[in-house]
């Protein structure tokens, strides 16, 4: 089982100074976020299946199951931080003086 690292620089689109905003970037970022959530869901499912298999049938290695659980936990914490940042940004937008 290989562990894949999450690299934020590869997820975010590259932007250069003076470049005008394109509408495609907004949908692209949304698709990237959706893909990240799908990946997180798959990781959670794999971890739950591994735990279930280890406890019921004894299949699998305890250290591999622990690694999968920690990976799933890390992805959940990352999603929670992103959620908190989005909510905080939204609150700041609401409080802006027009």
From Swiss-Prot:
<comment type="similarity">
    <text>Belongs to the FliE family.</text>
</comment>
<dbReference type="GO" id="GO:0071973">
    <property type="term" value="P:bacterial-type flagellum-dependent cell motility"/>
</dbReference>
<dbReference type="GO" id="GO:0009425">
    <property type="term" value="C:bacterial-type flagellum basal body"/>
</dbReference>
<protein>
    <recommendedName>
        <fullName>Flagellar hook-basal body complex protein FliE</fullName>
    </recommendedName>
</protein>
<feature type="region of interest" description="Disordered">
    <location>
        <begin position="22"/>
        <end position="56"/>
    </location>
</feature>
<dbReference type="InterPro" id="IPR001624">
    <property type="entry name" value="FliE"/>
</dbReference>
<keyword id="KW-0975">Bacterial flagellum</keyword>
<dbReference type="GO" id="GO:0003774">
    <property type="term" value="F:cytoskeletal motor activity"/>
</dbReference>
<dbReference type="GO" id="GO:0005198">
    <property type="term" value="F:structural molecule activity"/>
</dbReference>
<feature type="compositionally biased region" description="Polar residues">
    <location>
        <begin position="23"/>
        <end position="56"/>
    </location>
</feature>
<dbReference type="Pfam" id="PF02049">
    <property type="entry name" value="FliE"/>
</dbReference>
